[in-house]
UniProtKB/Swiss-Prot annotation:
Domain of life per record: Eukaryota
GO biological process, one term: retinoid metabolic process
Keywords, ordered alphabetically: Disulfide bond, Endoplasmic reticulum, Hydrolase, Microsome, Pyrrolidone carboxylic acid, Signal
Organism from which the protein derives: Rattus norvegicus (Rat)
Primary enzyme class: hydrolase
Enzyme Commission code: 3.1.1.88, 3.1.1.-
Residues the record lists as Pyrrolidone carboxylic acid modifications: 37
Active site: 237, 354, 465
Main localization, broad class: other
Name of the protein this chain belongs to: Pyrethroid hydrolase Ces2e
Signal peptide interval: 1-36
Localization of this protein: Microsome
Gene3D superfamilies in the record: alpha/beta hydrolase
């Protein structure tokens, strides 16, 4: 209306010729209509066509967000594109609807053992399909092409076998911190990571999907108010492993400028492999393809229906990325040790009880219920073999973690701490130490015991695997609602501010927040709780045990075995 008043001050509308009067009012009405349409049903350009989003008011804020859901960043990976690198999406005519979530990638939802979690969850209404290479964008409603806001690209977790973009709502993060949030999907399980170990199927299809999504962001995010030169990738668990893998991959160079790894790095055991033989043999047997060679097997697998592929996927419960010579030229440990990675600022962190409750509940072991020292020795021998350690190392594990305790409950708790250290904590500290000499690393341990979980889990579990997620990103797990206390709301705002500051400047600190020092030789890190405080030398004794004591013992065992062989 200000524009109307300005026009009237120049020339009264009634003094204009009739036809011109009509044109002016028509333009004003059109202007108002376009403005309204842009707010409620925004339309943005991409390099393949236009997309229409929707306006969302974010609770507890004065801000609104425009959401654009299910934008294709690659062709559907079906037919000849099954087990193939993603290809650019086809252009479309007209305006594409971006107001509903895309189908999740093929996965074994029933394999999650959700009934063990004692949490009431409603099944996701999201459908499932191989045609799943889509991303969603959450951008502050005031943005325009020149807004140049920092971009945060979220990569979901789920062991490379489960997960979907629609579980994570970026609206809160976008509204509170004035950033553009992108959530992406990638192929999972067999369809995402199966490899023949040769040129017929190199594998890492899911990682290549993520690269394609990051390339799409570089091409298009400016139309959604984002700055392609200020992209931070962040993820949790397998999402953190993905982020860490992009840091060492030559294919991802230049596609991002900061990295956040929550409870997952590329050195996590069993999620990066030098070989694919075990899974190759299993899939070949399950498929009924009777392959003469890998080329024939891949040809046969591409002919299988979606239902047949899902049936195979449901039996092969775990799968890893592979050293394929392309996305991962060498094992991440070698790439990190030889400083063959992108020196970008990073936040790396873990939770205080990574193996505290949810992972053991998803993979229940009846032998742990009535454990004693004798049965624990047998469990540790078996565990050592699974860790690819000599069985003789089980005595060292017993001494380091169990001490002389006889109590069954304490033995269980200590076993879970050992597993959390082996799988999550030690790899995270190792990656942080490799990277800190070449770019700033900010390390954290999330320690808060969430009030809404205290009646569900054992009291000794403080911050379990995934517990930081509701505090960092608007998070909805299959319609499970989280109710924060007032203190927890403040903690969430602090964590969101740290993460967004990092996305904006490569440094999480700002006025009003407890200072978070970079990890240096003083080994300082941030303990994230209701009142964040700086800690020093996180798990230093355990780190020494896993990286010095155990390897030394293994070398001694190997030496004695070699001497015995010579005799």
């Amino acid at each position: 209306m200000a524009q109307t008043r300005a026009w009237k001050s120049i020339m009264p509308l009634e003094s204009l010729p009739g036809w011109l009067n009509a044109v002016v009012w028509g333009l004003l009405l059109l202007f108002c209509q376009v403005q309204g349409q842009d707010s409620a049903s925004p339309i943005r350009n991409t390099h393949t066509g236009q997309v229409r989003g929707s306006f969302v008011h974010v609770k507890d804020t004065k801000s609104g967000v425009h959401t654009f859901l299910g934008i294709p960043f690659a062709k559907p990976p079906i037919g000849p594109l099954r087990f193939a690198p993603p290809e650019p999406p086809e252009p479309w005519s007209g305006v594409r609807d971006g107001t509903s979530h895309p189908a999740m990638c093929l996965q074994n939802i029933d394999g999650l053992n959700l009934e063990n979690l004692k949490i009431k969850m409603s099944r996701s209404p999201v459908s499932m399909s191989e045609d799943c290479l889509y991303l969603s964008i959450y951008t502050p409603a005031h943005t325009h092409k020149d807004s140049n806001l920092p971009v945060m690209v979220w990569i979901h977790g789920g062991g490379l076998c489960w997960g979907m973009a629609s579980t994570y709502d970026g609206s809160m993060l976008a509204a509170i911190e004035d950033v553009v949030v992108v959530t992406i999907q990638y192929r999972l399980g067999i369809l995402g990571f199966f490899s023949t170990g040769d040129e017929h199927a190199r594998g890492n299809w899911g990682y290549l999907d993520q690269v394609a999504a990051l390339r799409w962001v570089q091409q298009n995010i400016v139309h959604f108010g984002g700055n392609p030169d200020r992209v931070t990738i962040f993820g949790e668990s397998a999402g953190g492993i993905s982020v860490s893998s992009h840091v060492v991959s030559p294919m991802s160079q230049g596609l991002f400028h900061g990295a956040i790894m929550e409870s997952g790095v590329a050195l996590l055991p069993n999620l990066i492999s030098n070989t694919s033989e075990v899974i190759y043999t299993m899939v070949a047997n399950l498929s009924g393809c009777e392959p003469v060679d890998s080329e024939a097997l891949m040809s046969c697998l591409r002919e299988k229906s979606e239902e047949e592929m899902l049936a195979i996927n449901n039996i092969v419960r775990t799968i890893s990325g592979v050293v394929d010579g392309k996305f991962l030229p060498r094992h991440p440990l070698e790439l990190l040790a030889s400083v063959d990675f992108h020196p970008v600022p990073s936040i790396i962190g873990i939770n205080s009880d990574e193996y505290g409750w949810i992972i053991p509940m998803l993979h229940p072991d009846s032998t742990m219920k009535e454990i004693n020292r004798e049965t624990m020795r047998a469990v540790l021998k078996n565990t050592a073999v699974q860790m690819m350690l000599p069985p003789e190392c089980s005595d060292l594990l017993m001494e380091e973690y169990m001490g002389d305790t006889e109590d069954s409950k304490t033995l269980q708790i200590q076993f879970n701490e050992m597993m959390g250290d082996f799988i999550f904590v030690i790899p995270a500290l190792q990656v942080a130490h490799f990277q800190r000499s070449h770019a700033p690393v900010y390390f954290y341990e999330f320690q808060h015991q969430s009030n809404f979980l205290k009646d569900i889990r054992p009291p000794h579990v403080k911050a379990d695997h995934g517990d930081e997620l509701p505090y960092v990103i608007g998070y909805l797990f299959w319609d499970m609602k989280f109710v924060f206390t007032e203190e927890e709301k403040l903690l969430s705002r602090k964590m969101i501010k740290y993460w967004a500051n990092f996305a904006r400047h490569g440094n999480p600190n700002s006025e009003g927040l407890p200072y978070w020092p970079a990890l240096d030789h003083d080994e300082q890190y941030l303990q994230l709780d209701i009142q964040p405080v700086v800690g020093r030398a996180l798990k230093a004794r355990r780190l020494k045990f896993w990286t010095k004591t155990l390897p030394q013992k293994i070398q001694e065992l190997k030496g004695s075995q070699d001497n015995h062989t010579e005799l």
